[in-house]
Amino acid sequence: MNNIYDTANQLAKEIQQSEEYMTYKIAKEAINLNFELKNKIEEFEKARYDAQIVALQTGKDDEAKMRHVQELYGELIQNQEASKYFDAEMKFNILIADINKIIGEAVQSLLK
């Protein structure tokens, strides 16, 4: 039987070689070269995070914060680089979520 750490290291390498990882990495590097766009994305991510925190703490969405997030996103996706970045980020996050789900299901009975 393989050492579980060897398997985990192999999984990490395969993630780094995946299309989702590579596409996200390239998109992120392109964003980092554009100072103005990078700042806009950071502003959007902070606004989205703040809106999520409020929703978690209060149990409801703050309409003004959500509207601000939507406005920022609407502006950003008009930019081709930003649109590619968000698409790549979403696909990478789906990959990681799927892997986490597989691992979670493997240990679920132990955690009950």
Q: Model-derived features: where do they sit?
A:
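Terminal, compositionally biased segments used for targeting/anchoring and flexible tails
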Residues: 1-112
